[in-house]
Design a protein with these regions (language model features):
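Gram-negative bacterial Sec-dependent N-terminal signal peptides
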Residues: 1-22
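Early extracytoplasmic/lumenal segment of secretory-pathway proteins
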Residues: 23-95
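Extracytoplasmic ligand-binding site segments that recognize negatively charged/polar headgroups
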Residues: 37-44, 82-83, 87-227
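A ligand-binding cleft/hinge motif common to bilobed small-molecule-binding domains
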Residues: 93-95, 241-257
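A bilobed periplasmic-binding-protein/Venus flytrap-type ligand-binding module shared by bacterial periplasmic
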Residues: 142-149, 185-186, 269-282, 301-304
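Periplasmic-binding protein-like
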Residues: 205-215, 253-276, 324-325
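Mature extracytoplasmic/periplasmic domains
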Residues: 275-342
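Conserved C-terminal helix/tail region of periplasmic/extracytoplasmic solute-binding proteins
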Residues: 335-368
Length: 368
C-alpha cells in the first residue's frame, strides 16, 4: 500500500513530534475493539482518555474481541471494515495475519523506542510473536475459588478442577477448548512438555475430552470474562477459570471471599492489530494511536488499573501502585517470580494452526 510505504519512512519523525501526517488528514473518529470489564476500563484510563485529550479524536468502544476473527472475516467479505484498532490474543493475531486480515507492523518504524533509545523490537523482544501483532500485556488464565467453600484445605493444584470428591460443587470453564484441553491432559498424566505433541493427534484430543467428561455435569460454561467472577461472588460455583486481572478485581477491589490458584496458570499475550484495508485517513489515525498507546509509560500506566504485566521491558521498572487502592501491583502480576513457579506456556502457533478443527470437535462434544 502506498501509504504504508510512506509511513515506514516518516512515522518515527512525525509521530514523535506529535504532529499529523502532512500527506494524510487523520480521521477524527475511531472504533477500538476490546474485551470489556476491568480490562477495557484499564485501557480507557491509560490510553483512550489521554489520547482523546491530546488529539480531540472521538473513540468509540466495541467489546467484541472474543469474536474478532469471525467478524473481521465477515467485514472483509462484505468489503466494509468498520473497526480501526482491535485488541486480540496472540493466537488470533497470527490467524488474522495469515489470512491477510491484519496489516503487517514494522515495530522499529511504527512504534516508539524506549526512553533510552532502545528500538521497540528489542524492548518488546520475544513477545513480538507475529508480523501483525503489537503486544500490550502478559496475562494468565487461572482458577479462582471460594475460600469459604473449600474447607481447611484450599486447592494448590490445577487438578483440583477435576477433584469433585475433594472439592464438591459446580465449576466454571470457558466454552472453548483452549486451556481446558491442556489442563485436562496435564491432570491425566501427560508431561507438561508433551502436551501439545499429544494434543495434535486425534487420540490426544479424545483423551482430553474424556478427562473433561468426568466433570462435564458439574461445569457451567462461560463465554464472557465477567461470568466466573460473578458466579464466584454469588457463591454459585466452588471454583472456575478466568483471567488473573478479573480475579484481582474480585479479591482486592470487591473484597469477596475468593482465592487465586497460580498453579499451571496459562501465560498468554494480548495486544493490538490494525485491520488490513483501512482508508488512508483511518489508517493514519490507527497508527498514531498505537504509537501513543504502546510507549513505555502508557503500558506501565495500564498496570495501575489491572494486574497484567506490561509487554515492554522498559515498562516493568515503572510498575507502581494501584491508582485507587494504593497497593503495590508487582506481587499481583502473573509474571511475579512467586506466582510463576509452575506456569504453562501457551503455544500460539499450535492454536493458530489447529483452532478451527479442535473448536469444531469441542463444540460437538459439548452438544452431546
Amino acid at each position: 500500500m502506498k501509504l504504508t510505504k510512506l509511513l515506514l519512512a516518516s512515522t518515527a519523525l512525525t509521530l514523535a513530534a506529535g504532529s499529523a501526517f502532512a500527506e494524510v488528514e487523520m480521521a477524527n473518529e475511531m472504533t477500538i475493539v476490546s474485551w470489556g470489564g476491568a480490562y477495557s476500563n484499564s485501557q480507557q484510563q491509560a490510553y483512550h482518555n489521554p489520547y482523546m485529550e491530546k488529539t480531540g479524536v472521538t473513540i468509540i468502544n466495541d467489546e467484541s474481541s472474543a469474536e474478532a476473527v469471525s467478524k473481521l472475516r465477515a467485514m472483509n467479505e462484505a468489503g466494509n471494515i468498520t473497526w480501526d484498532v482491535v485488541d486480540v490474543v496472540a493466537a488470533d493475531a497470527l490467524r488474522l495475519c495469515d489470512e491477510g486480515l491484519a496489516m503487517e507492523i514494522d515495530a522499529d518504524e511504527m512504534l516508539a523506542p524506549a526512553p533510552d533509545g532502545t528500538p521497540a523490537s528489542e524492548d518488546f523482544g520475544d513477545l513480538l510473536v507475529g508480523d501483525c501483532f503489537i503486544p500490550q500485556i502478559v496475562y494468565s488464565t487461572t482458577v479462582g475459588y471460594r475460600t469459604d467453600m473449600v474447607g481447611d484445605t484450599p486447592p494448590t493444584s490445577i487438578c483440583a478442577l477435576f477433584d469433585t470428591e475433594g472439592y464438591p460443587g459446580k465449576r466454571a470453564l470457558e466454552k472453548r477448548p483452549i486451556n481446558n484441553m491442556e489442563w485436562a491432559l496435564l491432570c491425566d498424566g501427560v508431561a507438561k512438555d508433551d502436551v501439545y505433541d499429544v494434543l495434535e493427534t486425534d487420540e490426544g484430543q479424545q483423551q482430553a475430552l474424556d478427562k473433561l467428561a468426568t466433570i462435564k455435569d458439574d461445569v457451567i460454561w462461560w463465554s464472557a470474562g465477567a461470568d466466573t467472577p460473578q458466579l464466584l461472588a454469588d457463591g454459585e460455583i466452588v471454583m472456575g477459570s478466568t483471567y488473573n486481572g478479573r480475579l484481582f478485581s474480585v479479591i482486592e477491589e470487591q473484597k469477596q471471599p475468593v482465592g487465586m490458584l497460580w498453579d499451571a496458570q496459562v501465560f498468554d499475550l494480548d495486544g493490538w492489530i490494525i485491520p488490513a484495508g483501512l482508508p488512508e485517513d483511518r489508517l493514519a489515525r490507527a497508527l498514531d494511536y498505537v504509537y501513543f498507546a504502546t510507549d513505555t509509560q502508557r503500558l506501565a500506566d495500564q498496570s495501575k488499573w489491572i494486574s497484567y504485566g506490561p509487554a515492554r521491558a522498559s515498562s516493568a521498572p515503572l510498575v507502581s501502585t494501584h491508582a485507587e487502592l494504593g497497593i503495590e501491583m508487582a506481587p499481583h502480576m502473573p509474571t511475579d517470580p512467586e506466582n510463576a513457579k509452575n506456569t504453562f506456556l501457551y503455544n500460539y502457533e499450535f492454536w493458530a494452526d489447529y483452532r478451527d478443527d479442535i473448536d469444531a470437535k469441542f463444540q460437538a462434544w459439548l452438544a452431546q
